[in-house]
Amino acid sequence: MRKVAIIGSGNIGTDLMIKVLRVSDLLEVAAMVGIDPDSDGLARARRLKVQTTHEGVEGLLALDEFDEIDIVFDATSAGAHIKNAETLRKFGKYLVDLTPAAIGPFVVPAVNLTDQLNRNVDNVNMVTCGGQATIPIVAAVSQVTPVAYAEIVASISSKSAGPGTRANIDEFTETTAQAIESVGGAARGKAIIILNPADPPVIMRDTVLCLTGDVDQDAVRDSVSTMVEEVSRYVPGYHLKQEVQFDRVSAADVRTLLPAGVGTVSTQISVFLEVEGAAHYLPAYAGNLDIMTSAALRVGEGIAERLNHAEAPRRSRA
C-alpha cells in the first residue's frame, strides 16, 4: 500500500479520502490536511482514524509519517496549489493536482494516463470536472477524424459548487479549453460552465460539440461508445444520455469559430452525457465532483502501480 496525503478538507478532498478508504487496494490515507480546524472534512477524518492537521502544508511537513508518503493530492485552489507545489517540490513526492493551476501536464485517465506515467513527471493536473467528462469524447472523435473545433458545455447543480469551484470559474474555462486542444486533439477548444439553480438538484449533464469534415458515422459512434465504456470503468455513473447526433453545417456559418488553416468543415457531431455521483460522501447529483475524485483516484493508483513495479526487481534481488 502506498501512503497518500490529501490537502484540502472541503467537498472534493473529503470525498477523495473516503474513496481511497473504501475502494482502493493500492492506496492508504496517511493524512488529511486543512486550514480550518472545525471543517467537516477534518472532523470526519479524525472519526475515521486518519491523521489530520489544520496547519496547511507546513503542518503536513511536521507530521511523523511525512517521509513515508509517496503521493500528495491537492484539492485546494489554483492559487494555493502553486504555493503548495513550490513547498513540496524538494521532497520528491508525486503531486496530483485537482485544481485548475495546471503546473504539470494534463491527465485524463481514459486518454493519456499511461503516456504521462511513462514521462515520469512528478506533478500532474486533473484539468477540471468538465474536462474529465468531455475531453474523452473529443479524443474519441479525434481518433476517427480531425476536429477543427470542439465546444463543451458542463451543466452542474449550483448546490454542488462550493467556494473553491466558484472562485475558479475563470480558470475552469481557460484550463478546460487548453486541455480540449492538447489532450482532446481539437484544433481549437472552448469551454462553458453553467451552475444550475434547480431544486431538487439535477445531476451533471455535459454537451460536446465537434466540427469536422465528412465522417464515417459508424466509426465515430463506435469510438465514442468504446471511450464511454473506458471512462465508466472508474466513473460508474458516466453514460451517454442519447445517441450521437450528426448534422450538416455550412462552413460559412461556423467560420468565426475556426482557426486558420483547418480543412473543410461540413459536419457537427453532438454528444450528450450524464454523470451521476457514487454518493460516497457527496450526494449523487454531484457527479461533477465525483468524476474529479474518481479520476484522481485512478491516477493515484496508476502512480502506485508504477512505483510497485519499479521496486519489484530490487525486492527480488534482495
From Swiss-Prot:
Q: Which GO terms describe its molecular function?
A: acetaldehyde dehydrogenase (acetylating) activity; NAD binding
Q: What is this protein called?
A: Acetaldehyde dehydrogenase 2
- Cite the SMART domains for this sequence: Semialdhyde_dh
**Source species:** Mycolicibacterium vanbaalenii (strain DSM 7251 / JCM 13017 / BCRC 16820 / KCTC 9966 / NRRL B-24157 / PYR-1) (Mycobacterium vanbaalenii)
Instruction: List UniProt keywords, sorted A-Z.
Output: Aromatic hydrocarbons catabolism, NAD, Oxidoreductase
Q: Which InterPro entries does this one have?
A: Acetaldehyde_dehydrogenase, Acetylaldehyde_DH_C, NAD(P)-bd_dom_sf, Semialdehyde_DH_NAD-bd
Q: Could you tell me what reaction this enzyme catalyses?
A: acetaldehyde + NAD(+) + CoA = acetyl-CoA + NADH + H(+)
Enzyme Commission number, as recorded: 1.2.1.10
